[in-house]
Amino acid sequence: MDMLRITNLKKHFGDKEVLTGLNLSVPEHSVFGFVGENGAGKTTTMKIILGLLKSDRGEVFVSGERVKYGQTATNRYIGYLPDVPEFYSFMTAREYLRLCGESLEMGKNDIEKRSDELLTLVGLSKENHRIRGFSRGMKQRLGIAQALLGRPKILICDEPTSALDPIGRKTS
């Protein structure tokens, strides 16, 4: 089964056509990446997949369900890490993951267990101070944990290692 299927996707901004009939299928249990120069439409495609941006034409299906602009029903299958993740700076990493878990309607015990696993995975398990004190690399690692929290079937990452130093890349 295809976890992601895109047919004849088109998008333009003003006079510039960014996507000109994109077609692709990504099977379950596979790895796929977009490679291209700035302005090639990589981030635009990701935002359309997430229902955050309206395409001019074409269809997107996630786990067999059609993605509709402005509706996030298919996002239950997706973990998303933007290029520069944003957080509530007054929270700790653990508090933030708890909030995200609640929005995903995860059980309290599952949230705590999964948060512990992921904070350990990304090397933030001992960080108890507010996110406002995190470096950009630490925020990127927290973004990775957030994207993985709900055990997504699809993980969409926009330049996921851009803020990680070599040690942070090994940790994540």
Regions found by a protein language model. Name each.
Residues R98, E102, N109-K126:
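Conserved ABC ATPase "signature" region
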Residues L155-D158:
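Catalytic Walker B motif of ABC-type/P-loop ATPase nucleotide-binding domains
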Residues E37-G41:
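Walker A (P-loop) phosphate-binding loop of ABC-type ATPase nucleotide-binding domains
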Residues I144:
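Hydrophobic anchor residue at the start of the ABC signature
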Residues R151:
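Conserved catalytic motifs of ABC-family nucleotide-binding domains
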Residues G58-Y69, A73-T74:
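Conserved ABC transporter NBD signature motif
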